[in-house]
Amino acid sequence: MNKSGSFYNLETIGGILLFIAAVIAIIIANSPFRVGYEYFLSINGSVSVGNLSITKPLLLWINDGLMAIYFLLIGLEIKREVNRGILSDKTNLLVPALTALAGLIFPALIFIFFNAHHPVYLKGWAIPTATDIAFTLGIVSLLGSRVPFSLKILLTAIAIFDDIAAIVIIALFYTEQLSLLSLSLALVFTLILIGLNYFKCRRISVFMLFGVALWIAVLKSGVHATLAGIVIAMTIPDEGKESMLARLEDGLHHWVVFLILPLFAFANAGVSFVGLDASMFTHPVVLGIGLGLFLGKQLGIFLSLGYFVQFKKFLKADKVNLAQVYGIALICGVGFTMSLFIGSLAYQNYDLSLMPMVKIGVVLGSFIAGLTGFLVLKLKQQ
């Protein structure tokens, strides 16, 4: 991976900032400032260009707007890795792809087990399937040499496939009623972006101009607007280390790590425990998410990756053992950012009263998975 040292350092900082932002949000949500916090996120913001006007609460500007930039960065990273990184060597694809798939199936099955008889609850089946790359790499980096670098690379590859799966899930299962006019405009802007690449336009400002137009069209189409970020990323030229893709990725990475993801965590992680009783923790949605992240992820990833390590001698040269694999499998249960995001999509048009359950399940499941994974890897070394 290019610039691997700076990448992992940045992800470490990002994981720490995410944790701080989430803790602050939880503290505020359980304090007298809770009303102000909720009011702040509900403030409407408007953007007008000519006759076109978009008005949304601040929370949705973050989730639909800023998160599109995050998905743009994800798309750029995936394209880079396919062209000349981890995913460019086809022999490196099978293990992380199958591991990520198993890490998706088991959490989904656990969620379905608890919510099969509740049609609305069941719409959140994908919530525990996600892995937060910033948090996971942040936790792993705190362990230093206890985790072989090759295992960190593998974790990154698994997270990339996890992101690809999340993109497909959002596109297929969390798309509203479609507007053919807006979709047609989105297709036109996509073709323009492809044309800019083909005719060797290398001005980021031109791509971003039509990228914003594409985002607006996708926003109005019924497809979730964040997917515009992925489409834009796939059209960005990539011709080597100093390419437009590399420059845009470098420029966005700091904004995403230091602003967008912490702001998303602050806006979405504010779960209030005021007035909660023990029965809330046995709610089917909470159990499905919490156990899906903690139990489902570790089962899926440990069984699949453990098989390759134990029986196919995968990573044998790096002396990776099953205890390290189990620790990594646990840490992959930190779904946080993407789990909260999918949760907001799953229930936003059905039952917003379920969002506190989503937050409780994601926070508890991610915390327990991350802590136990950290302890397993730390104690194994000792």
Curated annotation (Swiss-Prot):
Membrane topology, record value: Multi-pass membrane protein
Primary localization class, coarse: membrane
Transmembrane segments: 13-33, 58-78, 94-114, 124-144, 153-173, 179-199, 204-224, 256-276, 285-305, 325-345, 357-377
GO molecular function: sodium:proton antiporter activity
Keyword Nucleus annotated: no
Catalytically driven reaction(s): Na(+)(in) + 2 H(+)(out) = Na(+)(out) + 2 H(+)(in)
InterPro entries in the cross-refs: Na/H_antiporter_dom_sf, NhaA
GO terms classed as biological process: regulation of pH
UniProt keyword list: Antiport, Cell inner membrane, Cell membrane, Ion transport, Membrane, Sodium, Sodium transport, Transmembrane, Transmembrane helix, Transport
GO cellular component: plasma membrane
The organism's place on the tree of life at top rank: Bacteria
Function: Na(+)/H(+) antiporter that extrudes sodium in exchange for external protons.
Protein name: Na(+)/H(+) antiporter NhaA
The encoding gene: nhaA
